[in-house]
């Protein structure tokens, strides 16, 4: 087997492993355009993970997803967080509660609260700005 064949085999193996990691192993031969919205997001995350980053920055990764897809995405993010940091920009606080260890709340470009989800949700500044009380 020549060197390029070995490289091709290694790449295929890595793709198969990643497809399993992002729960798309049954969709390896499906065109991306035929995937569900959630599956397309998972594919994007998988493409990022192929580069083995230490930091992922995800902007509203569950926007437009069904409740089940949001749950599966939370599970995926928990699975892939070992050995890397994941920063998620998200307005869906129910989703944030599923995944976050630490929450930072910004308003007009300024940090107004930071801590656990419970701490942030009970912060008077957050309540005033986002709930209008």
Question: What is each residue range found by the language model?
Answer:
Residues 1-3:
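Short, small-residue-biased leader/transition segments that mark boundaries at the very start
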Residues 18-39:
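Conserved ABC nucleotide-binding domain
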Residues 56-60:
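Catalytic Walker B motif of ABC-type/P-loop ATPase nucleotide-binding domains
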Residues 70-82:
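Helical segment within the ABC ATPase nucleotide-binding domain
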Residues 96-98:
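A short, surface-exposed alpha-helical micro-motif characterized by mixed small hydrophobic
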Residues 114-115:
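ABC ATPase "signature
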């Amino acid at each position: 087997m020549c060197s390029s064949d070995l490289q091709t085999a290694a790449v295929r193996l890595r793709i198969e492993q990643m497809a399993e990691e992002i729960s798309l192993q049954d969709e390896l031969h499906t065109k991306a355009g035929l995937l569900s919205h959630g599956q397309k997001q998972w594919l994007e995350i998988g493409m990022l993970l192929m580069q083995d980053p230490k930091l992922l920055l995800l902007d509203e990764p569950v926007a437009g997803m069904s409740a089940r897809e949001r749950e599966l995405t939370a599970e995926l993010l928990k699975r892939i967080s070992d050995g890397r940091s994941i920063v998620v920009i998200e307005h869906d606080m129910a989703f944030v509660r599923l995944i976050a260890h630490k929450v930072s709340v910004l308003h007009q470009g300024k940090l107004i609260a930071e801590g656990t989800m419970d701490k942030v949700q009970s912060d008077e500044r957050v309540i005033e700005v986002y709930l209008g009380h």
